[in-house]
Every structure is written in structure tokens, then in C-alpha cells.
């Protein structure tokens, strides 16, 4: 496949994940979520837990595609890699500052600024994966990804790393390096879901996506391409499920079993969409998600800022309490708020797509 040609199935799957992230993060009222749109409180797995790791997996694929133009040579690619990684981290910090500031009303108080977050994790994991891509043979990627998962599992195994307690090594490292005030919810949940130690398995997530990106680009035959994705996805899903008996599925800890399971689901989902969209050319049913997937990071950042402003201006509460709750009730009304907010963000995506504007960070 030509790496300069946009892969519609990849855009669509990215769009599905971004739409899912917006729905999960923007409900009408906290606590009134359908189970599918609520994260597992600790151990366990729900559809809501899938969207972010799937996006990271897809970022691994995009990393392979974007570095093809540099032929994976370090010298020409290094400036782009560092610039993009730092930009993602910077945007994440600005977003955290903005949300914290409008809540407190103090735009100069950084004492409770969350240092890690979704964009920061994307920036760090992209940077590490991309630097590895231009410095080591790609055949070592999958073994290295597995080694990182094993190392993290050992940390968890011998550091009480599966328990929701103050002596969990994952949370202890987050607290020691970041400080409780700079963690998610000021450390009240013991660990930061995008924390320091759990970045290790998150890098593995992106690296596995990178391997699948190599399959998509290097294998020219669609049948072989889909077969390879299917085999990898099935293997990862099966191993992740088996491993979950010894290593619980846990998004907050980004456990090794969670990485393997979600990578498996992502690979199988992409194989299915490749068949439906790129082979069978059934595209018309997916244009809605393409609008989100063509500019995923722009839509995500916009949704976070817009969502924060709607809460700050009390529009969020007014719409839910005075309109959606009386019409639909607590749970469905809360869900409908997310749907309307999703459509609102989709307008931006639609305009950018129709004008063929693709904003790359």
C-alpha cells in the first residue's frame, strides 16, 4: 500500500474511538452512566475501557506510515519526532492548566496542575516508539514489546501492583515523582491512570500497533494483509484473556493482560473494517466516523475544551436538568447529552473533512 494514500478503514476506526472517548467523557450527570459507557472501577473490563488503548494502538500504525516517508532514517526524522512528541505533551499540559484554572478561577496557581494525562501519554509513547523505529530493526519490535510487558508485570507482582492501596508500587512511584497534588484527582485514587510506571505497557501498546502498521503497508495483497491482522489479533486476544486469570484486566494500571486484550480487539476490528470498506468498498455507512477520524486529535482537544467551558458556564447543568432529564430521565437523559455533544463536535470534523483540511500535530 502507498503510505501517502489515506486508508479509509484506519480513519473510520480512529473516528469510532474518538467518538467513543467523547461519549464516555461527556455525560449529562456523573453517576448516571449506562454500564457500557462507564469505566471499570478497578479490575474488570467494559467497552468504555477500550477506546483510549485502541487509539494508542492506531497511533502506532500511523507512526509506521508517517515514518515511511523518511525511510526510517534517524537523521531526517529526528527533528519531526521530537517536535511532535513535545507538542503533544505541551498541548496536554495546556489543556490540564485550562481545565484546572477555569474551575478554580486562578490562572496562575499551578499547585494542583495534573502533569500526566491523555495527550501527555500520547506524546511520550509516540516519541519513544518513533525513536526506536529509526534506531533498531523492526523485527525486534514485537519481542521488545513483550519484554516491556514482562518487566512491568514483575514490578506489579513484587510491588503489590494489583491492589487498590497506598502501597501499590504503581501509585507509590506516581506519588514520589509527580506528587499527589499533580496526579489525577490529586491522588485520591492512589494511582494516576496515565502515570509514570504504567507508561511502560502503554509504550508496548503503541509498538504492537506499529507492527500492524508494517503489515498494512508492506503486504500488498489484501487477503494476506487481513489474514495476518486476524492471526495477530486472535493470538493477542486469546493470550490476554488467559493471562487475565493471573494478571487482572485493569485500565487504571494498564495491566499487561489489558494491553494484549485491547490490542487483539483493535487488530481484529481493523481487519474487519479493511474487508468491509477497502475491499468491498462499502463506505457510505461510515462517513459519520470518518469526520472524527480524519482529524482525531483536533476533535479530541476541541471536545475537552468545549466540554470544560459548558460545565464552567453552567450550560451543561441547565441542558441536562431543564431539558434532557425531564424528557428522558436520569440515565437516558445523561446519555443523550453525550450524543448531542458528540454531534456538536462532529460539525467541526465534517467541515474540516469536506474542505479536505487535515491538521497534523
Per-segment meaning from a language model:
Residues 1-361:
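Alpha-helical transmembrane segments and their immediate juxtamembrane cytosolic regions
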Amino acid at each position: 500500500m502507498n503510505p501517502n494514500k489515506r486508508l479509509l478503514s484506519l480513519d473510520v476506526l480512529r473516528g469510532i474511538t474518538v467518538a467513543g472517548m467523547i461519549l464516555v467523557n461527556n455525560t449529562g450527570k456523573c453517576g448516571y452512566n449506562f454500564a457500557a459507557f462507564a469505566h471499570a472501577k478497578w479490575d474488570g473490563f467494559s467497552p468504555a475501557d477500550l477506546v483510549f488503548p485502541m487509539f494508542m494502538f492506531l497511533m502506532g500504525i500511523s507512526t509506521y506510515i508517517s515514518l515511511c516517508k523518511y525511510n526510517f532514517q534517524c537523521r531526517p526524522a529526528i527533528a519531526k519526532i521530537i517536535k511532535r512528541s513535545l507538542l503533544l505533551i505541551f498541548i496536554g499540559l495546556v489543556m490540564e492548566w485550562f481545565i484546572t484554572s477555569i474551575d478554580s478561577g486562578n490562572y496562575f496557581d499551578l499547585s494542583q496542575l495534573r502533569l500526566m494525562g491523555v495527550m501527555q501519554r500520547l506524546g511520550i509513547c509516540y516519541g519513544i516508539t518513533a525513536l526506536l523505529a529509526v534506531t533498531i530493526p523492526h523485527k525486534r519490535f514485537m519481542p521488545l514489546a513483550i519484554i516491556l510487558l514482562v518487566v512491568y508485570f514483575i514490578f506489579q507482582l513484587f510491588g503489590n501492583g494489583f491492589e487498590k492501596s497506598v502501597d501499590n508500587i504503581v501509585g507509590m512511584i506516581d506519588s514520589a515523582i509527580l506528587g499527589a497534588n499533580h496526579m489525577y484527582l490529586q491522588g485520591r485514587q492512589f494511582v494516576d491512570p496515565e502515570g509514570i510506571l504504567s507508561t511502560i505497557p502503554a509504550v508496548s501498546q503503541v509498538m504492537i500497533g506499529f507492527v500492524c502498521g508494517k503489515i498494512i503497508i508492506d503486504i500488498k495483497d489484501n487477503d494476506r494483509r487481513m489474514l495476518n491482522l486476524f492471526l495477530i489479533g486472535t493470538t493477542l486476544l486469546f493470550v490476554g484473556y488467559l493471562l487475565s486469570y493471573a494478571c487482572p484486566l485493569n485500565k487504571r494500571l494498564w495491566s499487561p493482560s489489558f494491553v494484549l486484550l485491547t490490542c487483539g480487539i483493535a487488530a481484529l476490528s481493523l481487519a474487519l473494517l479493511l474487508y468491509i470498506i477497502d475491499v468491498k468498498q462499502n463506505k457510505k455507512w461510515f462517513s459519520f466516523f470518518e469526520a472524527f477520524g480524519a482529524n482525531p486529535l483536533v476533535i479530541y482537544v476541541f471536545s475537552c475544551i468545549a466540554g470544560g467551558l459548558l460545565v464552567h458556564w453552567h450550560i451543561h447543568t441547565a441542558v441536562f436538568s431543564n431539558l434532557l432529564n425531564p424528557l428522558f430521565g436520569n440515565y437516558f437523559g445523561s446519555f443523550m447529552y453525550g450524543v448531542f455533544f458528540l454531534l456538536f463536535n462532529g460539525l467541526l470534523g465534517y467541515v474540516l473533512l469536506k474542505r479536505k483540511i487535515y491538521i497534523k500535530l
